[in-house]
């Protein structure tokens, strides 16, 4: 982490962050909900230092005090948005729960290699003070508060709102959005104060996705297809951009890291597309599709056509490359976005997925591949599931990937993963010409955990990363 006489947490700029130290440990949530194992979810600490004797191993586990929380994403008590405030210290990891609506605050400052629970925010505080539930993305704000997106109301209906936590006491302060302002659905968000804007995305109604994915729910309007544009200073919803059938279930959203940038990218899961969003001359915002992953005609699967299902995207800190995962097809892609309106595919790697050879699915028509990809084996283990959450090293030269998306959907689309556990892999990245290569020496097999196979999701470095930190 950057050090100076008067600076706060993180780094002065995205390019400064690229010069930060190499990651040595990562934190990631491990989930038992829906697996048949009645144990609490836990925060795992994994050693990713190649020089360490415990490299590629879980070195600590912090179980939560409750079961069936569905730990999912995480954020920080403070980050690079507070770089100018020397009183701020990045020492707490914020863990909102997707199903229970709890928020766990974890102390990672006292002993970074052995985190400890600092505080639990119970769901009734979120219900009563905010009228929200099903928590997802956590971002630290420049003012020192913590903002968490919500996907629904306490009854399971879709409702896109935001919970504010005090950055010191971690008490629920109330809603970020002004009274009466709400989006139809919620999921991820990213703010860009220099343009007085925040944009949020849409998954769907919790009562729909909590029971598994059904195409009927999409047709019934239970899933989102819009970007919601908020006035950052007035906390009002000022515009909704309907992405249409090419933008079904827009999930992860990333502005370019340059705080002056007035554009970014969003991944649309079901449509398997990437949209560029941008500010127009009149101050309104618009979106255009810049990448389309074609579906594959298949036999032996739930539907006659299989989408890629783009479930996570990242932009490198220098705004040169886009990375995303196709959870169903099984590949991670690298695009040169120097010309963001015309991304160029420069790297691709398959890591499992539903179309690999020897599986139940036969591909009948494929607009991209000549044959189905081979299964991937690392250290003797055939990789189950498909690549899902991805995290890029600060220097952009390594990607870490896990295979679980959400326990109910894991159970539905990759039932063997509940028996075998998720995996964590590492990919080497060519940042000159482009290219992705699997590191054969790195595997965390979550099928061998002490309490039985577990699902693993989003990754965080102690010093921040390209999806946790926002520069203002």
Swiss-Prot record:
Keywords: Cytoplasm, Membrane, Nucleus, Oxidoreductase, Protein transport, Selenium, Transport. It is found in: Nucleus; Cytoplasm, Cytosol; Membrane. InterPro entries: Se-bd, WD40/YVTN_repeat-like_dom_sf. GO terms for cellular component: cytosol; membrane; nucleus. GO terms for biological process: protein transport. It is a peripheral membrane protein. Pathway: Organosulfur degradation. SUPFAM superfamilies: 3-carboxy-cis,cis-mucoante lactonizing enzyme. Pfam families: SBP56. It is an enzyme of class 1 (oxidoreductase). GO terms for molecular function: methanethiol oxidase activity; selenium binding. Its EC number is 1.8.3.4. It catalyses: methanethiol + O2 + H2O = hydrogen sulfide + formaldehyde + H2O2 + H(+). Catalyzes the oxidation of methanethiol, an organosulfur compound known to be produced in substantial amounts by gut bacteria. Selenium-binding protein which may be involved in the sensing of reactive xenobiotics in the cytoplasm. May be involved in intra-Golgi protein transport. Belongs to the selenium-binding protein family. This is Methanethiol oxidase. It comes from Xenopus laevis (African clawed frog).
